[in-house]
Amino acid sequence: MTDVCHGYLIGKGLLRWGRQILTEVTVGIETAPRAMSIEARTIRKLRIRILPFVFLLFVVALLDRTNIGFAALTMNKELAITSRQFGLIFGIFFFGYFLFEIPSNLLLHKIGARIWIARILITWGAVAALTGFVHTVHQLYVVRFLLGLAEAGYFPGILLYLTYWFPQREQARAFALLVTANPVTTILGAPVSGLILDHVHWLGVSSWRWLLILEGAPAVIGGVLTYFLLPSRPQEAKFLTADEKEWIRAELGREEQHKLEQRRYSTLKALASGRVWHLVLIYFGMMISLYALTSWGPQLVKSLSGPYTNSMVGLLLAIPNLMALTVMIFVSRSSDRMLERRYHVAIPAIMAGTALVLLGTTRSPFYSVALLSFLAVGIYSFLGPFWALPSEFLTGFSAAAGIALINSVGNLGGFAGPYTIGAIATRTGNIYAALAITGVLSFISATLVLLLPRKARAPKG
């Protein structure tokens, strides 16, 4: 009964906080005054018509990355999965993701976002549902690898897609709204996943299987909606007037010309660019931290919270992500307003590293959730300003290739982090030493960010 009361109080607080955040997110999307410049009118329409749709699609995308962490609470025992094996199960997804990432993004740029994003959603939704039918660890390895192949290109594809619509000075905020899907997915998905694990045993089938099957369906639905609703380019958007389409074309054209005047990047030059690989290294270190949180977070909280149910674990994990959602919106707005990226990327990385190092110093559920909150704030606040960096010097096919390279190679941290933590946990019996090591990597990422060259402000046109 106490657990139910705790859950009710936490849930009530999360809802109240969520309403406040929703108000903050929608600032700037309110009813426009009668007299509004074409720029303000166009950006407002894009924020209303493009961002919410791609945001919801990305929430769907992230369910398969968070639900495996929750499924592990009961799946690992049923399939006799060790910590090392679970790290490999989580991480092997990123090998498939890595192999097809760059070709997928180039195909999106060539074929069009509507068709290609719909294809990605439908295929990965089907494969995600298949995960619930595995019976051995090796079958799980295969399906997770196939899931990575199916999903490859989705996140960098959406980032590339947003660069077709938003000028550079608006991109950090647009990217940040997209990556708020990370904490929002956990805020919504963690309690739901916990409830499914505790209560859904239909037809005598294990609850973790239903969790994986049910959370694959939204991707298929999202793929169908994408095919019919998502315009590939501004010229196809029925909600824009002719002068608004022309404003976007002219504004993005000016920015592209400015980049070309500074330096021309072909696709191959982008893939070989030292500046692109500099961003790859930064992202790799931070992805180790991100997937340490998403893969091991449920098991870490469960081990500290004793008799709490899976539903309660889900509610506790929602707290760090709700705090992160609040702060990352502020950080991205500050980055766009100041047109500054380096410190808006480096400081959150330092916060994440500090939290990871300190996690091993306490066994208190309260302080652990507080440190996980600090970690989530650091990781997610990093993402919006970071993803505004590649578009400062890449355009067209070079942007498609460069963004995909950064995301695909950087996301191999999603393999390295969970697998290393699992291997150390299997050998030592705890994960805290491994978490401290990942914290050091976040500090290295922060240092690399500060070594990036300063950029002249983009022209406003």
Regions found by a protein language model. Give the residues of each.
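Extracytoplasmic gate region of multi-pass secondary transporters
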Residues: G69, G274-L325
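Cytoplasmic helix-loop-helix junction between adjacent transmembrane helices
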Residues: L146-T180
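Conserved MFS/SLC helix-loop-helix module at the cytosolic interface between two early adjacent transmembrane helices
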Residues: F100-H135
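Extracytoplasmic
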Residues: R49-S83, L293-P298
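C-terminal transmembrane helical hairpin of 12-TM major facilitator-type secondary transporters
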Residues: R341-F386
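Helix-breaking motifs and short loop linkers at transmembrane-helix boundaries and internal kinks
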Residues: A80, G112, F133-H138, L339, ...
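Cytoplasmic membrane-interface "Motif A"-like loop-to-helix N-cap segments
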Residues: K110-L121, D336-A349
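Glycine-rich segments within core transmembrane alpha-helices of 12-TM secondary carriers
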Residues: A176-S193, A219, V409-A416
